[in-house]
């Protein structure tokens, strides 16, 4: 479906270094969340054996919320620490036992700014608990193809860049903050590079 939508929208999407996703599986795939159309933007990269982390509120969305839960995706209640810990622990076990990757937007919500927002900790707790690598993924700014304020879409080119995996094996909770800084720093640098290459 995403291929059809890309053709309809006139988007030319290139994915750089996509091999990092398969080579690192199972992994936590940390993705820059640019717009409501990210399902189309990143659709060609989404692995076959993967689930998505979403906030608990997603479950309340009619039809979509039911589908999200029914397909095995992970819901986390950020307002209830004990519930969040239990969800992360269960998710870590699934990642290890079923060897599934987890797709997550670490900023927590959409951000069309060139500067990444502070990252949420949940996915990093999961990566440490499961002892699987983190694969950062960024894309070029979408302001040339999506006008979110006027709800307009234009044809154009989008570049997605998959960065080398960042290992977590042997790391613990004491390494959480440095790990977050490393991942965010590499993603920001990659976004900045894509912007400079676009001229």
Regions found by a protein language model. Give the residues of each.
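Catalytic core of membrane glycerolipid acyltransferases/transacylases, capturing the structured
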Residues: 6-8, 23-81
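N-terminal membrane-anchoring alpha-helices
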Residues: 1-14
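Glycine-rich helix-loop-beta junction characteristic of Rossmann-like nucleotide cofactor-binding loops
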Residues: 18-22
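Thr-Gly-centered strand-to-loop micro-motif
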Residues: 16, 53-55, 77-78, 106, ...
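Generic preference for hydrophobic
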Residues: 15, 29, 52, 160-162
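Non-catalytic C-terminal accessory region of glycerolipid acyltransferases
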Residues: 85-199
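A generic structural signal for well-ordered alpha-helical segments
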Residues: 5-6, 68, 95, 127
């Amino acid at each position: 479906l995403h291929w059809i939508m890309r053709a309809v929208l006139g988007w030319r999407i290139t994915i750089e270094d996509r091999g990092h996703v398969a080579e690192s599986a199972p992994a936590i795939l940390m993705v820059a969340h640019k717009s409501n159309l990210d399902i189309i933007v990143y659709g060609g990269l989404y692995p076959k054996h993967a689930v998505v982390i979403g906030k608990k509120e997603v479950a309340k969305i009619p039809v979509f919320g039911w589908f999200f839960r029914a397909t095995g995706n992970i819901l986390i209640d950020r307002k209830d620490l004990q519930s969040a810990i239990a969800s992360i622990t269960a998710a870590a076990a699934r990642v290890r036992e079923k060897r599934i990757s987890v797709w997550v937007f670490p900023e927590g919500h959409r951000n069309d700014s060139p500067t990444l927002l502070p990252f949420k900790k949940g996915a990093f707790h999961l990566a440490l608990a499961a002892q699987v690598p983190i694969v950062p993924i960024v894309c070029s700014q979408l302001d040339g193809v999506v006008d979110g304020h006027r709800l307009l879409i234009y044809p154009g080119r989008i570049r997605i860049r998959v960065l080398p995996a960042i290992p977590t094996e042997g790391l613990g909770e004491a390494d959480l903050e440095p790990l977050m800084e490393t991942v965010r720093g590499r993603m920001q640098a990659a976004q900045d590079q894509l912007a400079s290459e676009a001229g």
